[in-house]
């Protein structure tokens, strides 16, 4: 205690006097600093307050200095009489032995009847008297013995002010007078007295029975005190003090006697105003401000205000202390390692309430419990981020569970035309899609709600403090809804694509049949495009009958005619894609038609290959020209587009919301799909004819070769000698390669020869001459096979030579005929 003044003559420590109330009747915060420096706020109710009232220059400060060993400023009489103490000053008297008594706040009050104060002295005297009576366990009245009997010198006016002020305090209190809560101790200290003048009992009778009782009878008392006695309001004590200068030793003994009486009998065991030490300064400040503003006091209201102020302060301090623990919990929650949130939260609240009650329990219980409830609610509020982190992890787990459940329930398997969803037919599952997803959502939401309830806290403390957690779950619910919706939308989109794929497949499968019709000889524009429109009509009817309920189940909030319009769009789109695909392979179609018409013919209702050997050269040319013309006719069929005859369903695309799952597809419209243009332009047609010309010629030349071979027969004699020389020269490398391979087989050939000799030798050895009869047929067959192979080789060579001879003669016909075909194709 740096400001303590050691006093060997006393068993206590004291502080230097500090201004409490300044000359303008304003409280000084420096006094609060003094209290804090001495850890006064830790005392609880174990302290007392003593103040002294009396006339100016009556020796109040010197009396307090003598009794408690303090160092209040005193008047120097050698310099004349003047005002020394201005305002109120205070000091602490602290027992050296903490168990020997309470700490005492000693307040030295500016003297009354001050000439320096002038006309404002009465106001200050009233305010200071009210303040001292409100905050003091004991008010010392300093009187001079020789002034007893005088009106002014005996402080009669001051005593009257004290009585009236104390009545005002008692009237404002809700406590009964008999309880003793507001029985302020009035201790009269009679100065310059010694026993030879008059016994103290006589002086007591004079002061109490004449002065105080006279004042009691003269003042106007409130109705509740009409029948009350003076002793119901005050407790009187009286002590005599010898002359300090004439009899200093006796004065010192009298001071010691009063100090002992204060410590043993006068001072209460605890502060009688029931204000904890940490709230004393604020209580005194509020009392002074109320006296200045209203000139009267409402003590219970002041206590309630003090309790509310201090408890709020304590609550704020406790919340600050809880921040590290809450941060630690938040870290654990964010890392996903907290499984005991409720237990840890209750422990945290218990610690907070314990710290709070350590100080707040000294104040009004109703107020402290009310703010204690607020403390618990504030702790719950600070735990909101922890709660959010825990629920966020649980929502992530629920998202995984949602994905698993949705994939199990809506797994697509099977063929495209008859898909299975979750082991059931898609047509049975899709109409109930929204209902099934709602069931899964309800199951997962129940899990979320159970987890939220497991984190709820209904806190109750033995002190009466209780509160229930009210964590904001809106963020958790929103997170769950968004997460589940995203999972559902992903599955929904996948199944809608599967449904649209089925609609498209209706057209694709139909075009496979229509594509076969393009190879027919008698195909026409009316027949082809009629088949296309019939396919669209059938597919559209099938969509409405079997897929409408599926679409309604998959897509929420379906507008009237929405599916009809969408199905029409998908069918047109699929039709357009198939037509474009057909047009892109026009060259292959033409070649397939030509090959089918040119290479095959109808015979007895069956398609058989043509026997070109039976055709004359003119018939071959006519057949070639006719087949080429029929093959190219398909171009005119494809170019003669016919728009769909199906009427477009009436549907307002503007009625769709932008968040519709198929908004982009439906917004495209059908106008572009109903266009009658074709990609087979004149330029494309010319390129197509050029690409087909070479293949046509190859087919024709092959037919000519077969025809020539059939007419000329196969004979090596018909082949001119120069051809043999040319053949020998061209195939010389191949012959050498064959010979090298044969001669390289140096082991196989000897083995074959050796095997033949061994078999023949042993056969003759065993069977004799009859063995020749057995081997002769095998030798004859081997020679025949060799001759057949040789004849076949000569036949192929002869045919090749004949074709080469006749090729030049036919080139002019093919060239002229192809030019005519190109012109006809361009006209088509």
UniProtKB/Swiss-Prot annotation:
Compartment(s): Endoplasmic reticulum membrane
Biological process (GO), any one: endoplasmic reticulum membrane fusion
A single GO molecular function term of this UniProt record: GTP binding
Entry binding sites for GTP: 54-61
Membrane topology field: Multi-pass membrane protein
CDD domains noted in UniProt: GBP
Disulphide linkage map: none
Gene3D superfamilies in the record: P-loop containing nucleotide triphosphate hydrolases (3.40.50.300)
EC number: 3.6.5.-
InterPro entries: G_GB1_RHD3_dom, P-loop_NTPase, RHD3/Sey1, Sey1/RHD3-like_3HB
Function: Probable GTP-binding protein that may be involved in cell development.
Protein name listed in UniProt: Protein SEY1 homolog
Organism: Babesia bovis
């Amino acid at each position: 205690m740096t400001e303590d003044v050691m006093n060997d003559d006393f068993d206590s420590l004291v502080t230097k006097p500090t201004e409490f109330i300044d000359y303008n009747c304003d409280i000084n915060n420096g006094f609060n600093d003094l209290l804090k420096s001495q850890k006064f706020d830790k005392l609880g109710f174990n302290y007392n307050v003593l103040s002294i009232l009396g006339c100016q220059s009556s020796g109040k400060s010197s009396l307090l200095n003598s009794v408690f060993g303090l160092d209040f400023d005193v008047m120097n009489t050698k310099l004349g009489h003047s005002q020394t103490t201005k305002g109120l000053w205070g000091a602490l008297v602290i027992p050296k032995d903490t168990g020997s008594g309470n700490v005492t706040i000693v307040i030295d009050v500016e003297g009354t009847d001050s000439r320096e104060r002038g006309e404002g002295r009465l106001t200050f005297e009233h305010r200071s008297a009210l303040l001292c009576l409100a905050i003091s366990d004991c008010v010392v009245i300093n009187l001079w013995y020789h002034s007893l009997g005088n009106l002014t010198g005996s402080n009669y006016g001051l005593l009257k002010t004290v009585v009236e002020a104390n009545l005002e305090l008692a009237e404002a209190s809700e406590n009964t007078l008999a309880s003793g809560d507001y029985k302020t101790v009035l201790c009269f200290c009679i100065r310059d007295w010694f026993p030879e003048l008059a016994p103290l009992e006589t002086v007591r009778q004079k002061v109490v029975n004449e002065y105080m009782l006279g004042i009691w009878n003269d003042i106007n008392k409130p109705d509740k005190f009409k029948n009350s006695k003076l002793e119901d309001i005050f407790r009187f004590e009286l002590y005599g003090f010898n002359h300090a200068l004439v009899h200093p030793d006796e004065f010192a003994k009298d001071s010691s006697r009063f100090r002992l009486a204060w410590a043993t009998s006068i001072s209460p065991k605890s502060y009688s105003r029931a204000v904890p030490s940490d709230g004393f300064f604020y209580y005194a400040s509020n009392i002074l401000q109320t006296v200045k503003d209203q000139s009267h006091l409402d003590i219970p209201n002041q206590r309630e205000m003090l309790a509310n102020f201090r408890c709020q302060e304590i609550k704020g301090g406790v919340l600050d202390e809880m921040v590290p623990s809450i941060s630690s919990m938040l870290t654990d929650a964010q890392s996903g390692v907290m499984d005991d949130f409720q237990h840890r939260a209750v422990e945290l609240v218990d610690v907070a309430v314990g710290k709070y009650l350590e100080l707040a329990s000294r104040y009004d219980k109703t107020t402290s419990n009310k703010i204690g409830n607020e403390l618990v609610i504030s702790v719950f509020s600070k735990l909101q981020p922890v709660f959010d982190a825990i629920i966020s992890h649980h929502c992530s787990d629920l998202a995984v569970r949602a994905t698993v459940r949705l994939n199990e329930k809506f797994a697509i398997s099977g063929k495209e035309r008859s898909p299975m969803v979750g082991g059931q037919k898609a047509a049975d599952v899709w109409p109930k899609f929204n209902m099934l997803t709602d069931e899964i959502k309800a199951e997962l939401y129940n899990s979320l709600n159970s987890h939220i309830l497991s984190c709820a806290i209904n806190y109750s403390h033995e002190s009466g403090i209780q509160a229930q957690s009210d964590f904001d779950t809106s963020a958790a619910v929103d997170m769950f809804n968004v997460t589940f919706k995203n999972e559902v939308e992903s599955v929904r989109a996948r199944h809608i694509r599967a449904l649209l794929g089925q609609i498209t497949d209706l057209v694709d499968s139909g075009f496979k049949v229509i594509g076969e019709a393009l190879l027919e000889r008698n195909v026409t524009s009316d027949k082809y495009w009629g088949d296309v429109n019939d396919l669209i009509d059938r597919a559209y009817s099938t969509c409405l009958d079997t897929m409408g309920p599926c679409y309604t189940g998959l897509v929420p909030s379906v507008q009237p005619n929405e599916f009809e319009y969408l199905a029409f769009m998908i069918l047109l789109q699929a039709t357009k894609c198939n037509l474009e695909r057909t047009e892109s392979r026009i060259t292959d179609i033409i070649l397939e038609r030509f090959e089918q018409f040119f290479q095959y013919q109808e015979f007895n209702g069956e398609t058989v290959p043509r026997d070109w050997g039976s055709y004359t050269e003119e018939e071959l040319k006519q057949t070639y020209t006719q087949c080429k013309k029929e093959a190219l006719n398909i171009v005119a069929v494809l170019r003669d587009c016919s728009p769909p005859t199906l009427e477009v369903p009436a549907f307002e695309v503007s009625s769709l919301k932008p968040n519709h799952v198929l908004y982009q597809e439906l917004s495209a419209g059908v106008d572009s799909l109903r266009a009658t243009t074709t990609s087979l332009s004149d330029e494309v047609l010319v390129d197509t004819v050029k690409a087909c010309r070479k293949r046509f010629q190859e087919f024709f030349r092959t037919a000519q070769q077969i025809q020539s071979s059939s007419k000329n027969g196969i004979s090596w004699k018909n082949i001119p000698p120069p051809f043999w020389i040319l053949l020998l020269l061209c195939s010389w490398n191949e012959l050498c390669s064959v010979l090298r391979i044969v001669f390289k087989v140096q082991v196989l050939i000897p083995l074959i020869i050796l095997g033949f000799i061994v078999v023949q030798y042993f056969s003759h050895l065993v069977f004799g001459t009859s063995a020749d009869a057995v081997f002769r047929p095998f030798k004859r067959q081997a020679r025949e096979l060799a001759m057949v192979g040789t004849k076949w080789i000569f036949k192929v060579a002869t045919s090749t030579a004949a074709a080469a001879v006749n090729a030049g003669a036919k080139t002019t016909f093919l060239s002229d005929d192809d030019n005519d075909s190109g012109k006809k194709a361009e006209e088509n």
